[in-house]
């Protein structure tokens, strides 16, 4: 895992002596802002303590609607469990989140689950922890440890990937300037989402957010090109 703070500090010190490195500093900071980590597929983990069984499920999600659908599914599947607690985090900025104790003492279930999501810097993820009571009370600290450990097991079993935040741009241009446009596309390597060729050509490209300003700046120099 990259230590962006460390990179930032080194680049800043270097830029104090070399003004030309300011672009590198800006690029490194932008790179850290348009990436995020999530999981590829569902994974599970199990933790037991004093005969209580904690079953954790980590699921990739994109919306609150998906979260609700998964919760309904697992609440039905584990209808006989004492508690079905959860936490989720959504969006590349990691601002949309929630933790739920589902009847456990306040802060003993949802919060430690969310803590594991945060410690792994994940988003677009839902972690559900199902508890089957074993007849022996664990106490507040015991519950916190158990829910944290179960969530950690599920996340550890998952495949974590880093994704980029992408942006799309659509523009029109006249056919005689096709070579100029394609030269930019070849060198900047955006993904072509849509293209149509006539006397007035239309194209939609997608590229990493931090690289969009450069792409647009180069396209703006192509004669007759105009953005939609």
Go through the PLM ranges and name each one.
Residues 205, 211-214:
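Terminal, non-globular segments
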Residues 160-175:
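Short glycine-/aliphatic-rich beta-strand segments at the starts of folded cytosolic domains
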Residues 31-107, 194, 221:
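C-terminal regulatory domains involved in ligand/effector binding and gene-expression control
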Residues 192-197, 221-228:
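Conserved short beta-strand edge segments in small beta-sheet-based binding/regulatory domains
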Residues 184-186, 215-223:
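Short amphipathic alpha-helices in soluble, non-transmembrane regions
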Residues 173-189:
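Short amphipathic alpha-helix segments
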């Amino acid at each position: 895992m990259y230590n962006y703070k460390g990179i930032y500090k080194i680049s800043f010190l270097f830029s104090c002596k070399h003004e030309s490195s300011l672009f590198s500093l800006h690029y490194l900071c932008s790179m850290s802002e348009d990436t995020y980590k999530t999981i590829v597929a569902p994974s599970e983990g199990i933790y037991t303590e004093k005969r209580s069984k904690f079953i954790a499920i980590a699921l990739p999600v994109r919306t609150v609607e998906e979260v609700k659908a998964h919760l309904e599914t697992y609440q039905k599947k584990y209808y006989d469990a004492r508690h079905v607690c959860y936490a989720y985090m959504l969006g590349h900025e990691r601002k949309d989140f929630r933790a739920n104790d589902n009847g456990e003492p306040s802060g003993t279930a949802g919060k430690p689950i969310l803590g594991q999501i945060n410690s792994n810097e994940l988003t677009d993820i839902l972690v559900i922890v199902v508890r089957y009571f074993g007849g022996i009370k664990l106490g507040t600290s015991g519950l916190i440890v158990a829910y944290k450990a179960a969530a950690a097991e599920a996340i550890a079993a998952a495949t974590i990937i880093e994704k980029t935040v992408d942006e799309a741009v659509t523009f029109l241009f006249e056919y005689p300037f096709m070579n100029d446009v394609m030269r930019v596309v070849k060198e900047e390597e955006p993904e072509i989402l849509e293209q149509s060729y006539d006397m007035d050509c239309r194209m939609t490209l997608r590229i990493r957010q931090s690289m969009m300003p450069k792409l647009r700046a180069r396209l703006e120099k192509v004669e007759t090109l105009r953005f939609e």
